[in-house]
Amino acid sequence: MVLSAADKTNVKGVFSKIGGHAEEYGAETLERMFTAYPQTKTYFPHFDLQHGSAQIKAHGKKVAAALVEAVNHIDDIAGALSKLSDLHAQKLRVDPVNFKFLGHCFLVVVAIHHPSALTPEVHASLDKFLCAVGTVLTAKYR
């Protein structure tokens, strides 16, 4: 999916508002995903999935870091997330639909914390960006 110049500006604008909360939002996104889509828990059998667990916070930090990396390299998301794509496709074998679930939950978290920033245009841009990230992460699946 091709992001327009306006999309890129909108995505960078949202992430500038997220700022120092990215790790917190990453953990909240995971908690929402595990609640709304309980089948996603199967990839984390060794995790304490209770609210506020250290493992969810740590993985939320990784999710946030990957999204920030994608934003920082918005013109080359595939290059920025290549190793992560390999990991998810070849080692973890995560069902690709889970990236859509994660993206949806991230949109909800952004909407809760920054409702005025999530205009229809920004929402569409952020959704396109998250779809692009999901596409990159599933590109190496066979």
Curated annotation (Swiss-Prot):
One of its GO terms (biological process) is hydrogen peroxide catabolic process. Red blood cells. Pfam families: Globin. Heme b binds at H88. GO terms for cellular component: blood microparticle; haptoglobin-hemoglobin complex; hemoglobin complex. The keyword Transport applies. Heterotetramer of two alpha chains and two beta chains. Involved in oxygen transport from the lung to the various peripheral tissues. This is Hemoglobin subunit alpha-A. It comes from Anser anser anser. The lineage of its organism: Eukaryota, Metazoa, Chordata, Craniata, Vertebrata.
